[in-house]
Swiss-Prot record:
Description of its domains: Has three domains with a flexible linker between the domains II and III and assumes an 'L' shape. Domain III is highly mobile and contacts RuvB.
Gene name for this UniProt entry: ruvA
Keyword DNA repair: yes
Gene3D superfamilies with a match to the protein in the record: 5' to 3' exonuclease, C-terminal subdomain, DNA helicase RuvA subunit, C-terminal domain, Nucleic acid-binding proteins
GO biological process, one term: DNA recombination
Region (Domain II): 64-139
SUPFAM superfamilies recorded: DNA helicase RuvA subunit, C-terminal domain, Nucleic acid-binding proteins, RuvA domain 2-like
Homology family: Belongs to the RuvA family.
Intracellular or extracellular location(s): Cytoplasm
Region (Domain I): 1-63
Protein name in the entry: Holliday junction branch migration complex subunit RuvA
GO molecular function: ATP binding; four-way junction DNA binding; four-way junction helicase activity
Annotated segments matching region Flexible linker: 139
C-alpha cells in the first residue's frame, strides 16, 4: 500500500499531478487547492490514500493530514465518491468545511459541483459530531474513523468520545472507547 510519495512534480493539471519518484511517474488525484500549491520541477511530499477498485487503482494526494482525514471520512458517506470529495476539498479548506457543517450552511455546500440538496443534507447529517471542538481534534477524528470502520454508528461514537479523557493517545482512546461500546 502506498501511503506517501516524495518526488519531483512533472506535470500539474486541475485535479491531477504527475510525480516522478526514482524513475517511476505516478498520476495522483489532488484537489485544486493542492494543485495550486505545487510547482512543476519542484520536489513535493504528498500523503497518499490508495483506493483499489475493480476497474481502477487510484492515488489521492494531500499536503496536509487534516485534508486526508476529511477526504477519507467523506468517502464513507453513501453517494460521495472521490470526484465529489475532491470537489469539496477544492472549494473549501478543512477549516472552512468544518465551519459550514457546524453552522449547517446547506446552501454553501450545494454550490460545490455535483452536490444537490439531497446529498448536501446527507453530508450534514453524517458529519454532525465528526468535527470535535478541542485541541485534541485530529486525534479524536482518527479515533472516530477507526471506530466507524469497525461498524459502530456515528451517534454511539459521539457519545463515547464525549466521555474520554482529553489527553489520551489515539491507541488508548480507541481501547477505552471499545470497552465502553462493548459494555
Amino acid at each position: 500500500m502506498i501511503v506517501g510519495l516524495i518526488g519531483v512534480v512533472e506535470k500539474i493539471s486541475a485535479l491531477e499531478v504527475h510525480i516522478e519518484v526514482q524513475g517511476v511517474v505516478y498520476g495522483v488525484q489532488v484537489s485544486m487547492r493542492t494543485a495550486a500549491l505545487l510547482e512543476a520541477g519542484q520536489k513535493a511530499r504528498l500523503k497518499i490514500l490508495q483506493v483499489i477498485k475493480e476497474d481502477a487503482h487510484l492515488l489521492y494526494g494531500f499536503l496536509e493530514e487534516g485534508e486526508k482525514i476529511l477526504f477519507e471520512r467523506l468517502l464513507k458517506i453513501n453517494g460521495v465518491g472521490g470526484r465529489i470529495a475532491l470537489a469539496i476539498l477544492s472549494s473549501f479548506s478543512p477549516n472552512e468545511f468544518e465551519s459550514i457543517i457546524a453552522t449547517k450552511e446547506v446552501k454553501r455546500l450545494q454550490q460545490v459541483p455535483g452536490i444537490g440538496k439531497k446529498l448536501a443534507d446527507k453530508i450534514m447529517v453524517d458529519l454532525i459530531g465528526f468535527f470535535i471542538q478541542d485541541e485534541n481534534r485530529p486525534a479524536r477524528n482518527e479515533v472516530f474513523l477507526a471506530l466507524e470502520s469497525l461498524g459502530f454508528k456515528s451517534a454511539e461514537i459521539n457519545q463515547v468520545l464525549k466521555t474520554l479523557k482529553p489527553n489520551l493517545s489515539i491507541e488508548a482512546a480507541i481501547k477505552e472507547a471499545l470497552q465502553q461500546l462493548r459494555s
